[in-house]
Structure formats: C-alpha cells, structure tokens
Amino acid sequence: MLDLNFKGSWRQYQKQVLDRFQDYQADGHVHLVAAPGSGKTTIGIELIARFGNPALVLVPTVTIREQWVDRIQTAFLENEQKISDLVSQNLKEMKALTIVTYQAFHSAMNQLQSQEDGEAEDFVGFDLLASLRAQKVATLCLDECHHLRNEWWKSLEAFRKQYEQLQVISLTAT
C-alpha cells in the first residue's frame, strides 16, 4: 500500500473523477482528459495511491518527471516522510513509485543505452520485465500520453503484451 495522503482540498471536477474510482478499479483503466493546469498530476497521484500497488509512471520529459516528484513531496507526504523512501527516478533502483521518461522506458525495454538531458543510462542486458515483476508493479500511469512518439508506443505495446495484469491511468490534455 502506498502511504500517500493528499493534504489539500479537491476541486469539484477532481472530486467527480475520484468519486468514480470503483468504476475505474473494475475496468482496470482510467483515461482522463483535462485542460493544462487542471490538476491531472494530482489526480494521477491520488489514483495511484487508491489503487494501492507499486506503480510505474511514464512522463515525456525530465522536467515533468521532476514536477511529479515535487508534487508528491509538497502535496502528499507528511513532514517526517522521505521522498527517497517511496519514489525512484531510476528503473534499475525501483521503489513503490518509480517515475521515468518514456525514453528511458523505451531504452530499457529494448536494452539500449539512453542519453537524456545529460543523464546517461546503460540498459544493455537489463531485464525490465523481471525487475517490474520483482517490484510487483501493478499500476502504470501514462502522463501526457498525447506526446507518445511512435517508437515509445511500440515499446509500450510490446510491454503490455508481456505484462498483462496492469491497472492503467492515462492522463492527457487533448
């Protein structure tokens, strides 16, 4: 179970989404379309917490990855909680909540070397599926999923065929 508790108050439209959580849980997926700045990241974090399983969050850029970490820290964690105990930004060192870019995921799925915004990672020989299974990841969150590039989509499709038991949260502005 993820120990995340939102410290703020929900906007009416956010509450409407969250009130349907049991429907999403039964369906195994949530697809949320909302305007930029409407709080999709916050809803995504709350849905992950409610699903209660280790989760993998995929984002289009390192900047957005950092925004997720910051939002978790400021809006969900109590003062005594350490973000590093709960969140990882590295597929090779997964935690209950692992947040990486689509590019890093693509590189790991295809066992490639990755270079992104000055961050280098070598996934040659790395078994992403085995690592996800060992971590018992059961929730996948796709942030800004309208930004998916063709090669990222192919990696996600291959992943979904091999890793079927996932609850999927898709967040998009279009």
Model-derived segments and spans:
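Conserved Walker A/P-loop ATP-binding site and its immediately adjacent core
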Residues: 41-76, 104, 152
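SF2 helicase catalytic motif II
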Residues: 102-105, 110-170
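Conserved motor-coupling elements within RecA-like helicase/translocase cores
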Residues: 88-98
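Conserved pre-motif I regulatory segment
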Residues: 1-33
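Residue-level preference for the first positions of well-ordered beta-strands
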Residues: 29-31, 54-56, 96-97, 139
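Walker A/P-loop
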Residues: 26-47
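The conserved Walker
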Residues: 36, 61, 172
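Conserved RecA-like helicase motor-core motifs
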Residues: 31, 76-89
